[in-house]
Amino acid sequence: MLTATPLPHQLLATFLLVLASATQPAVPASTDRAALLAFRASLSPPSRAALSSWSGPLSPSWLGVSLHPATAPAPSVTTPSVAELSLRGLNLTGVIPAAPLALLRRLRTLDLSANALSGELPCSLPRSLLALDLSRNALSGAVPTCLPSSLPALRTLNLSANFLRLPLSPRLSFPARLAALDLSRNAISGAVPPRIVADPDNSALLLLDLSHNRFSGEIPAGIAAVRSLQGLFLADNQLSGDIPPGIGNLTYLQVLDLSNNRLSGSVPAGLAGCFQLLYLQLGGNQLSGALRPELDALASLKVLDLSNNKISGEIPLPLAGCRSLEVVDLSGNEISGELSSAVAKWLSLKFLSLAGNQLSGHLPDWMFSFPLLQWLDLSSNKFVGFIPDGGFNVSEVLNGGGGQGTPSESVLPPQLFVSASVDTVSWQLDLGYDVQATTGIDLSGNELCGEIPEGLVDMKGLEYLNLSCNYLAGQIPAGLGGMGRLHTLDFSHNGLSGEVPPGIAAMTVLEVLNLSYNSLSGPLPTTKFPGALAGNPGICSGKGCSENARTPEGKMEGSNHRGWLGGWHGENGWVSLGAFCISTMTSFYVSLATLLCSSNARNFVFRPVRVEY
């Protein structure tokens, strides 16, 4: 499952505030100056040193201080009052000095994020606040019920990445004016409050992020009543039960992330009502049933992640209507049948993973013909027949059209930017899907046979290629050495024969090579990977290479941990990619694969699937 980047996996929320001036009467600047000096005095000595510029008359030269412009000349007001206080990332320590802050009666924005402030959340903050950001500190305890009532004008509240642990009170309810609420990356337990917004019918809430906590119980139906929502993040909790069908009433919703919970039932057909949805992530749950054909109404959908569930059945043809899809991850399910021609209509695809399902049949001719394709993973299925030798020249990135070193920005995994504004508040989300920038193809752990197509090794932009644990036969194409960007190559556990192409020695960026357990012969073209050819009895090394020479069995070099689809176990550990990859292949299966994939059987075995656009 692919997860959202955590940031690394997962998600970053940044609030960009453009706030109108408050209309409250001016307060003498001397009061604000005294309040700021009292605030500084309440901090630890090292923290005070960070605010050494706070001396002399109150002015914009004070670090982190923005002032209201003077409205009219008056002898009693020599300088404006404080409008914004932004002390982000100054390593401030201690408890938030709320009493001095409460004296800043025209303060609109308070940003104390990315410090080391501790203690509990205060309630005695300026009632004039429109934006409060206390994220990335060491605050503990609970979100007090007095906080919303003490800040009636608040539009954005960010308390993410703290140590808040106590359950939210069922009476906790925020005012309808609130536009963005981020409580993510804490350890808050208990149930989600049934009415997190006091007046959902008149709510201005755009963003609700409760992800990466310990919330349990069902998703409250009241969330579906907040019709203004554009981003709903409940991922990485312990939520259970069905997905509320009422979520389909959120017609403004652009991002829905319920991944990594314990949700059950089926994917509700009502989600088709979220016709503006760009990002749908339901992976890592216990969802079952078939894919809903009604989802074809999501014509704007760019990211669809239903990985690691129990979804069964075939990929329905109506999903061809989702023509904007760029990232599709259906891996780790129980999807069966042949590849649907609906997939062929997703011409904007950059990432496609159907790994770890029960898909069968032949790989269609159009499988490699997506013009923007960057990553294709069909591993650990039941595909049979030959790898189609066509369509390899279509994808710009896989053919090296993105420049040297890394693919061009236009074909990297999508960075979705969702923005919205209500009156004077705007916010922006950087939803970088957690897809590695590597370009690659993984067909391991299937029942593919025949020879490796020449067109496949002509894809100069490939950085990762895994065809292991199949029944491939014939020689390794000589053009393999021309794949100058390839850093991982695995052809192990097949029936390949002949000599290893000498061009492998010129592949300077190659880090992982596994050609073990085939029927390869001849000399070693390189000594960089001494264990990569284990289980090939015909391989020999050195100038005295003879027919009976053997290379010592070893382990694959240059490996790193790769996760559930196959483990690189240590730097010199054994390699086995694909959940169903067998550790050895007996001579019986090698012979059987060679027979089935012989040139005489080719026309009988291979029946290509053709799709007309």
From Swiss-Prot:
Q: Which Pfam families match?
A: LRR_1, LRR_4, LRRNT_2
UniProt LRR repeat ranges: 79-103, 104-128, 130-150, 151-176, 178-199, 202-226, 227-250, 251-274, 276-297, 298-322, 324-346, 347-370, 372-394, 435-459, 460-483, 484-507, 508-531
Membrane-spanning parts: 574-597
Q: Which UniProt keywords apply?
A: Cell membrane, Developmental protein, Differentiation, Glycoprotein, Leucine-rich repeat, Membrane, Receptor, Repeat, Signal, Transmembrane, Transmembrane helix
Traits of the deletion mutant: Fasciation. Flattened and wider ears with irregular rows of seeds. Thicker rachis of tassels and increased floral organ numbers.
Q: According to its UniProt record, in which tissues is this protein expressed?
A: Expressed in ear primordia, vegetative apex and young leaf tissues. Barely detected in expanded leaf tissues and not expressed in roots.
Q: Name one GO biological process term.
A: cell differentiation
Q: Which residues are glycosylated?
A: 91, 158, 249, 393, 466, 514
What's a single GO CC term here? plasma membrane
The primary location reported for this protein is: membrane
Tell me, in a sentence or two, what this protein's role is. Answer: Receptor-like protein that regulates shoot meristem proliferation. Based on additive and synergistic phenotypes of double mutants, it is probable that unlike CLV1 and CLV2 in A.thaliana, FAE2 and TD1 do not function exclusively in a single pathway.
User: Which protein is depicted?
Assistant: Leucine-rich repeat receptor-like protein FASCIATED EAR2
Q: What is the lineage of its organism?
A: Eukaryota, Viridiplantae, Streptophyta, Embryophyta, Tracheophyta
